[in-house]
Amino acid sequence: MAKRSKAYEAAVAKIEADKVYAPIEAITLAKDTNPSKFDATVEVAFRLGVDPRKADQMVRGTVNLPHGTGKTARVLVFATGDKAEAAIAAGADFVGSDDLIEKIAAGWTDFDAAVATPDLMGKVGRLGKVLGPRNLMPNPKTGTVTPDVTKAVNDIKGGKIDFRVDKHSNLHFIIGKVSFDVNKLAENYAAALEEVLRLKPSASKGRYIQKATVATTFGPGITVDPNVTKVLVDA
């Protein structure tokens, strides 16, 4: 196991190992214990009481973070004609059809989100083995298979993120940067938590959110009380 840096060990020392923190406390502590000199990402992870191998327990959706993630997403749009022009005008980073499909089929995935017009999904669907594992496959349930490419690009650029529970029953969200005000991070956290709770599968029995953790990119995890659904921000 790699030896932790002195900065990391100092950060860990500020955290009470067995304490479950209120969200605002955890976020404040995450900022305070960030061991990196750069503007690190603040992330939250939820461990869910679901079995993602079962279709009726899959948790997948989108959330519009009120303050964005602090990162401008690179958006790819599969479109032609007027829709392609609209995507370019909206600020999409990559726009095309057959050319992009061939490039991705060869292994290229240097983008953060993908949108497709419905007429191209027959071709785009063949990229499932490349895009699926990376959660990049356009999906009508997340608003990324749509004729309204302008809205889709604007939503993603504005802080809309897709999420899907992984095979270990975990969900991961970026809720901002260390440079964000604590209140903005707390409001982003609250938006993510609210959507996860809304999407609880009826087939999920017992405790739904089993654990919640907040951490910076290279910082220690801080356990958050998932039962606190209303995040009180600092005045």
From Swiss-Prot:
Subunit composition and interactions: Part of the 50S ribosomal subunit.
Family: Belongs to the universal ribosomal protein uL1 family.
GO biological process: regulation of translation; translation
Entries under InterPro entries matching the protein: Ribosom_uL1_bac-type, Ribosomal_uL1, Ribosomal_uL1-like, Ribosomal_uL1/biogenesis, Ribosomal_uL1_3-a/b-sand, Ribosomal_uL1_CS
Keyword Ribosomal protein annotated: yes
Keywords from the UniProt entry: Repressor, Ribonucleoprotein, Ribosomal protein, RNA-binding, rRNA-binding, Translation regulation, tRNA-binding
UniProt cross-references to SUPFAM superfamilies, sorted A to Z: Ribosomal protein L1
Keyword Flavoprotein: no
Reported function: Binds directly to 23S rRNA. The L1 stalk is quite mobile in the ribosome, and is involved in E site tRNA release.
The protein, known as: Large ribosomal subunit protein uL1
GO MF annotation terms: rRNA binding; structural constituent of ribosome; tRNA binding
